[in-house]
Amino acid sequence: MTQFPVLSRRLLSLCFIWFAAVGAAQPTEPLTFFVTSDSHYEAIERVERNDRNLITIERMNTLPGEAWPDKLGGGLIGKPRGVLALGDLIDDGDKNGQTDIEWKHFADHFGLDGTDGALKFPVFEGWGNHDGPPEKYIKQRVSVQTEIKRRNQLRLENKLISRVSPNGLHYSWDWNDVHFVQANLYPADKQNAKVRYSLPWHDPQDALTFVKEDLAATVGDSGRPVVIMAHCGFDTDWWVVEDWSEFYRAVKPYNVITYLHGHTGTGVRKWKSEGEEKFLDVVNTGQTEKGFFVVEVSADRLRLAYQVKRDPALLKDVQWEWRYQFEKRISRQAAE
């Protein structure tokens, strides 16, 4: 038997440790999750929207195990770790006789942890401009923001998330080595002084501070992938350009593989702050009644596509198809 010198044996041991560490840092299986927004649950008018939302949720439940589009390489869609719901959960966030009914519809359909609603996977929601003002301004029995705070505590207790902002609203968690940040309405600390638009309803409540502190504490210079989500994107007239730039500067040092939002439609685009070189890949996730995005993150690739109804108005015999197919290579190196 060959005898290795002591130094060589030590070097060999160090190599084994290094390879084990590298292997542990890489995801063993692709990460799958779904994204939707703007469910706008109704209480009195347009209540058929609630039924269309439920059809979409039922599609989420049955889609795992079906095939990815050939354009994105095929293969089977994995079981999602959860569903991201990016604001405008209900349509009337502070309206007598409607807010509580609409919230009940949302809770009954989406549930919380995948066992208590129609949806069979955990949901991670944020609020949008339709979801009502901060709780101290609310006139109804139910406040969406109060409910999000309550649900965040349950998520913490059940280890579905790992960190929550001091005000109880913004939160973050890890799936595999990917870090997720829920910034709710939009990632700023307060409404820009130039806007003056329905301030209580459009107060982001220190979301950007949470994003900054959370990424510094949990991601640092590791280079691991980051996904940031909010209701509004870089096309919203009351989250203004200078605030977009401040957000860009805050996340520039990190490996942000996508920014997810709702509010204004559906699509995939690239955006960067003026004067910058690197683009963010931005996904506008559409309305729940129409469809949802399927996202997969593997060791070196992000791929996503929109699973959408061919005719969103139908309540039976619904046909589904793929749109907005996108993929890119990703790394696990810090952005700068």
Range-by-range predicted roles:
Residues 93-210, 246-252, 258, 266-306, ...:
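Extended active-site neighborhood of metal-dependent phosphoesterases/phosphodiesterases
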Residues 229-233, 257-267:
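Histidine-centered catalytic micro-motifs
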Residues 2-12:
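Bacterial N-terminal signal peptides that target proteins for export
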Residues 38, 87-88, 128-129, 231, ...:
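Active-site glycine-centered loops adjacent to acidic/histidine catalytic or metal-binding residues
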Residues 10-21:
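Bacterial N-terminal signal peptides
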Residues 24-98:
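N-terminal active-site segment of His-dependent metallophosphoesterases
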Residues 33-35, 83-85, 125, 228, ...:
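Residue-level marker for buried hydrophobic side chains located in beta-strands
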Residues 215-236:
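Short acidic, glycine-rich surface-loop motifs adjacent to enzyme active sites
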